[in-house]
């Protein structure tokens, strides 16, 4: 009876097991230099700024969420790949980063992931958020369906993309201001 219960619980909760399996894969990628290769790739792209890279990622994340393509998230994608690439872009342009600017880039990279996922996922007709909103509104007597919610989410997703790109442009300006001062102080 106990083994049967454990087996059925394991099968019903296998998504948790899949999540746990991604952690060693991420560790192996980090151990064998994925982070360094990502930084080298970005350093070789001369015109790629931190803000441009994060804007591209925001666009990809939002489009991916709109078609229900999951790119994992903070621990599986931002920390091992996007954040090092964004920092590599700043290092190639300005030299070494101090802790304050490193944290600024980390936070912005995480924010772009959140914006893209949060505002992009409701564009997908069958996403859980759209179905929850449609079901709740129907129960309250409003005549809406999932398609109406998804259509109403498109302008919001576009606005979120525009605001994210503006935030990234301001990030580039802030990094330029902060790190150009640091470069001059070193000279």
Language-model regions, residue ranges each:
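Short helix-coil transition sites and intra-membrane helix breaks within transmembrane domains
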Residues: 14-15, 27-36, 66-80, 118-127
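Intrinsically disordered, low-complexity non-transmembrane regions of multi-pass membrane transporters
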Residues: 87-108, 169-187
């Amino acid at each position: 009876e106990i083994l049967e219960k454990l087996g059925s619980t394991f099968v019903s909760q296998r998504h948790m097991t899949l999540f746990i399996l991604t952690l060693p894969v991420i560790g192996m990628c980090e151990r064998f230099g994925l982070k360094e290769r990502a930084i080298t790739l970005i350093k070789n792209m001369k015109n790629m700024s931190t803000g441009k890279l994060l804007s591209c990622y925001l666009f990809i994340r939002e489009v991916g969420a709109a078609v229900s393509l999951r790119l994992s998230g903070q621990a599986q994608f931002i920390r091992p790949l996007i954040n090092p690439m964004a920092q590599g872009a700043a290092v190639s342009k300005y030299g070494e980063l101090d802790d304050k600017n490193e944290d600024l880039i980390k936070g912005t990279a995480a924010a772009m992931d959140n914006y893209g996922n949060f505002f992009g996922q409701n564009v997908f007709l069958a996403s859980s958020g759209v179905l929850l909103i449609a079901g709740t509104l129907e129960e309250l007597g409003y005549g809406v369906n999932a398609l109406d919610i998804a259509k109403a989410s498109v302008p919001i997703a576009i606005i979120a993309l525009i605001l994210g790109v503006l935030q990234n442009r301001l990030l580039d300006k802030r990094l330029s201001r902060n790190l150009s001062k640091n470069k001059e102080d070193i000279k």
